[in-house]
């Protein structure tokens, strides 16, 4: 929630990330103190949980700065288009109406590439989001994250047909293994 609240829509820059960082960390402390007593945040597992949340957030912001710098080096910019996007599309099959829905955490552009991003608080391994056959998405429970990303991309493009000719990338920012890409 601290990221969602503080991240501005529009072009992202290293300067913007540096400017919003103190507010993000302040909000993390506010969220924790709302759940825990002030004294409870100073020791034990509550203290460790707060420290872990701050470390994961710091790592994410470092990654974001690195990605912004890499994009800039390639004459591209990252522009945040939407946050917490409700996705919904009705599919009619054999006279039946099926509602497909989801919620993407972030929609942005890196240059001309539309990126549909889902944040994960845990780990995401590469083999969980990669697939070679569409059947894997249905038959292999370990491909649920890949299915989710594919569904989000499908829903977003159905709701926003103006982007259907764009290059689209769907992926996760997994906070526990950001360094693996």
Residue positions per predicted region:
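Phosphate-binding glycine-rich loops and adjacent basic patches that engage nucleotide phosphates
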Residues: 10-26, 107, 112-118, 157-171
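A non-catalytic, helix-rich entry segment at domain boundaries
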Residues: 2-83, 88, 181
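Active-site-adjacent bridging/hinge elements
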Residues: 26-33, 114-131, 174, 180-181
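Acidic/polar residues at beta-strand termini and the immediately following turn/coil
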Residues: 69, 90-93, 118, 173-177
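Metal-dependent nuclease catalytic regions and adjoining charged, substrate-binding loops involved
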Residues: 32, 141-144, 151-181
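Non-catalytic protein-protein interaction segments used by genome-maintenance enzymes to assemble
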Residues: 77, 82-159
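Active-site-proximal structural scaffolding
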Residues: 17, 21, 25, 46, ...
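Short regulatory "switch" loops immediately downstream of catalytic or recognition motifs
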Residues: 3-7, 65-69, 122-129, 157, ...
